């Protein structure tokens, strides 16, 4: 099994980074609105804070996922129909990554849980997200800017495993 296959099987997470701007719960509301425009419902914001670490979790799912869940068709659920995110508004205490396009270490404020099999969902979300926050950076194995996502989005049919590929190859 190759490294890429290992990543897909294990269910890697991904993050969004923002430089120099304070993140508030209003940003989370905007993210929820993006998913809603894409036809997703959201759970309530679940406060998963621990001590000084503030974290809110939101689960998103669409009609197809709900139908299959209700009809007990769990083995046919499509990963593109459901995702969980974790929002960290207190950037000062989160660990960061050095982001080459930003030229400094920047903390992540949004994590996507288990992105495996969610290439279509993430590409659509990021295309809409980067229209509102063009300076942010998405990271799984590689860093992706708005320009990278725009190139991918324009290339139909979409590559389902784009998030494991170097954006320099697009």
Residues covered by each model-derived region:
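Acidic, proline/glycine-rich low-complexity IDRs
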Residues: 2-13, 120-170
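Polar/charged alpha-helical tracts
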Residues: 5, 26-37, 64, 68-76, ...
């Amino acid at each position: 099994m190759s490294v890429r296959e290992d990543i897909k099987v294990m269910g890697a997470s991904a993050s969004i980074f923002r430089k120099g701007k304070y993140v508030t719960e209003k940003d989370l509301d905007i993210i929820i609105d993006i998913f809603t425009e894409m036809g997703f419902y959201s759970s309530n914001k679940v406060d998963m804070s621990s001590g000084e670490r503030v974290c809110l979790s939101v689960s998103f799912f669409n009609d197809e996922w709900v139908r299959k869940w209700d009809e007990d068709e769990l083995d046919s659920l499509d990963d593109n129909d459901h995702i969980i995110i974790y929002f960290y508004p207190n950037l000062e205490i989160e660990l960061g990554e050095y982001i080459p396009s930003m030229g400094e270490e920047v903390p992540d404020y949004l994590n996507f849980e288990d992105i495996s099999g969610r290439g279509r969902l993430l590409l659509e979300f990021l295309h809409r997200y980067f229209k509102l926050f063009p300076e942010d950076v998405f990271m799984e194995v590689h860093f992706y800017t708005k320009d990278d996502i725009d190139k991918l989005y324009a290339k139909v049919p979409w590559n389902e495993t784009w998030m494991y590929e170097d954006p320099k190859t697009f």
